[in-house]
Amino acid sequence: MEQLVNELIEANVGRVLVDEPLARYTTMKIGGPADILIVPKHVAGIEKTLQLVKKYKTKWTVIGRGSNLLVSDLGIEGVVIRLGEGLDHLEVEKHRVRVGGGYPLIKLSTLLSRQGLAGLEFASGIPGSVGGAVYMNAGAHKSDISNILSKALILFEDGTIDWLTHGEMGFSYRTSVLQTKRPGIVLEAEFQLQIGERERIVSVMQKNKDYRRETQPWNHPCAGSVFRNPTPYFAGDLIEKAGLRGYQIGGAQISEMHGNFIINTGGASAQDVLSLIALIKQTIKDKFGVEMHTEVEIIGR
């Protein structure tokens, strides 16, 4: 591992941090250390990192802004690549937008709305990066990334870089091919938006932001929606009807504001959260006969 660290530093791939606590990089404020954390400063840095990872036969994981993640208390084995400053380029040409995978989604939706571009209003309250949003087909307010993405530039595990069209992304509810069938890193996304009326777009954005502020506990560390909605039900409704609102294990609590959110009240461990998730799953199955599936991504040792 020491030799790999030295080569990464010599290759100037970006910031190289050893045994770095990942709680600093997630909105849940939970997570043990990454053996090696890379914050690349350019695409070439990511490519070189993957070359070295392959050379040393080391496991690797990619994270964005950590908004939909629960990282193990034991951390993550191998190399963790965090997308951010090195992939935050933006190009707007009429209604076509090309943006780096590390660009903040809320910042992008706000900027484009002020330019009178419609289609990304649903993302006005979704924390995280563009790359993470494409990876999981993030959405809200009856819309999602699949409605606006035309193609995405992907760096695959074998080091090849290629564009995947909308059809090739295999989008479904909170899912894309990048999660299982074709693992890779979203370097860039191209969105097709619509030219609209600036005042109306900004108004919708504000309405969405206000709704989130009033109904979701973003004033506490959390990871967004914990469960996918089990059609035709809403996960939060089932959890609240089961009487679990406010239930707490350790420092992790089912939000009083929204049943599908688990908040870190202070000092929560990943195990606290996992115990709550298991309790919710079993309770909902026993009471309503419904299987619950997590939307939050659970990673690590």
Curated annotation (Swiss-Prot):
Limits of the FAD-binding PCMH-type domain: 29-196
Q: Which GO terms describe its biological process?
A: cell division; cell wall organization; peptidoglycan biosynthetic process; regulation of cell shape
Q: In which pathway does it act?
A: Cell wall biogenesis; peptidoglycan biosynthesis
Q: Name one Pfam family in it.
A: FAD_binding_4
The EC number(s) attached to this protein equal: 1.3.1.98
Which controlled-vocabulary keywords does the entry list? Cell cycle, Cell division, Cell shape, Cell wall biogenesis/degradation, Cytoplasm, FAD, Flavoprotein, NADP, Oxidoreductase, Peptidoglycan synthesis
Q: Where along the chain is the active site annotated?
A: R174, S225 (proton donor), E295
Has UniProt tagged this entry with the keyword Oxidoreductase? yes
GO cellular component annotations of the record: cytosol
Where does it reside? Cytoplasm
Which cofactor(s) does the record list?
A: FAD
Question: What catalytic reaction does the record list?
Answer: UDP-N-acetyl-alpha-D-muramate + NADP(+) = UDP-N-acetyl-3-O-(1-carboxyvinyl)-alpha-D-glucosamine + NADPH + H(+)
Q: According to its UniProt entry, what is the function of this protein? A: Cell wall formation.
**What's the protein called, per UniProt?**
UDP-N-acetylenolpyruvoylglucosamine reductase 1
Q: Which organism is it from?
A: Bacillus thuringiensis subsp. konkukian (strain 97-27)
> What gene does the UniProt entry assign to this protein?
murB1
